[in-house]
């Protein structure tokens, strides 16, 4: 699950993500996100400004997806959503996908020819880097 705070201020995090794998992944993700609210007073819980400024996962945009690897690879690094971070807010990306690209090898090769060195070899991550490269131009 990912969350974006549209009104995030410079110097403060505005993109949050929790990922987990396994049969209890959804419960684990929401448990971690909800843990931020457990010790708050009723007044704090009712204060939208407090939530916006102080609480992770109290934002305006949310994304989540359950997807099993289509590449035969496993591990937390392959769990969606993927993030691509940048100091320019408009160049940050968050992506989930329900697709299986058949030309990953060609796109990966093109990205590396241009000087990129993608950290993960998966269709969704390659798509994220391709879109990020276009934003960076």
Predicted regions and their residues:
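Conserved short alpha-helical segments that host acidic/polar catalytic motifs at enzyme active sites
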Residues: 1-137
């Amino acid at each position: 699950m990912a969350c974006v705070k549209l009104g995030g201020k410079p110097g403060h995090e505005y993109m949050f993500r929790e990922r987990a794998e396994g049969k209890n992944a959804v419960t684990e993700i929401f448990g971690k996100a909800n843990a931020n609210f457990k010790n708050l007073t009723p007044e704090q819980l009712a204060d939208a400004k407090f939530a916006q400024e102080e609480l992770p996962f109290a934002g305006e945009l949310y994304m989540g997806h359950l997807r099993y690897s289509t590449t035969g690879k496993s591990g937390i690094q392959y769990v969606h959503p993927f993030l691509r971070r940048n100091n320019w807010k408009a160049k940050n990306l968050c992506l989930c996908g329900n697709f299986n690209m058949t030309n990953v090898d060609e796109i990966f090769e093109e990205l590396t020819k241009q000087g990129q060195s993608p950290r993960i070899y998966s269709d969704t991550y390659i798509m994220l880097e391709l879109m990020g490269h276009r934003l960076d131009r």
